[in-house]
Amino acid sequence: MSARAHEEKKRLRALARARASAEAPRRETHARRMIEHLLASPVWPADSASPVMAYLALDDEPDLDGLWLARSAATVAAPRIDWDRKAMDAAILRSIDDVETTRRVRQPRAHGPTVEPADLGLVLVPGLLFDPAGGRLGRGAGFYDRFLARLGPAAVTCGVCYSAQVVDRVPTEEHDARVGMILTEEGMRETSAP
C-alpha cells in the first residue's frame, strides 16, 4: 500500500470513529431497529440448516447481542480470533454469557464447537465505513478479509454500521473483501458487489 493510501485510510478511520461516536446516544435504539430489520429480512434463515455468523461488538460498533435473545431457530456463531495464527474462526455461541474478553475483544470461549466458513449462510461484518459498491474499511488487521475469502459461494455477506458510516466511496485494494448487503438502522440494502 502506498504511503498516500495509508494516510487516506487513517484519515477515514478517524472520520468513521467520530461518526460512530456521534451515534452513541442512539446506540440501543439503532441496535433494536437493526435486529428487527435483520430478523424480518429474507436473508435471515428460518432454521438451523444455514448457520449465521454475527459478531460481538466493540464499543463503537452497532451492538447486535440481542440476536442471541431473539429465540430464532438459526444457529448463530461469532468470531473467535487466534492471535498467534492471525486467523478467525466461526465459533457457535449458544448464550451471550459464554463470552470471554481477550485483548479487549469479546469472543466465544476457547474450545467450543465451530462452523466451517464454507457452511455459513450469512455473515454479518462490522466495519468503520461501507460504500454502495460493497467496499469496506475495517480496522486494518485483515481478519475479515482473510475469513470472507474462505466462505462458500452461496454465503451472503452483510456489512453492519450506522447510516452515517455509509459513504460514496471507500478506498479498497485487491485483497479487500466486499459485502453484498449493508444493514443500518434505516434498513437493509443490496450493494453492487459482484
How should each PLM-predicted stretch be described?
Residues 2-119:
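N-terminal active-site beta-alpha-beta segment that forms phosphate/nucleotide-binding
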Residues 86-194:
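Conserved phosphate- and dinucleotide-binding cores of soluble alpha/beta proteins
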